[in-house]
Amino acid sequence: MTLYAPEAIAQIDALRSYYETKNRPTAARALDTALDVAEQQIALRPGDGLPAPRPYPELARPGQAWLKAGRYWIAYGTGGPPVILAVFFETADIPGRF
């Protein structure tokens, strides 16, 4: 089972709220699908993550990795039980928010 950090939960809630406000149920479903894919990838191949999102190598940190699922960049912890640390839409200002 993959855990979610409070920051990641807040980011997911904000994305869902935005999609609801904009009447974009397909986008909300795509977010859920991306999270499911990320959880599966982290559980099966935790070492396959990238050190940082490709456009932002400066975000590399020890003990965390990134993966792209759908249109989302997802950060997760690499030590201990799997924890999703952050979830960003691909065009978000990731360095400014992480």
Where in this protein do the model-derived segments appear?
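Basic, Lys/Arg-enriched alpha-helical interface segments
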Residues: M1-G63, R97
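Enriched for short, Lys/Arg-rich terminal
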Residues: L67-F98
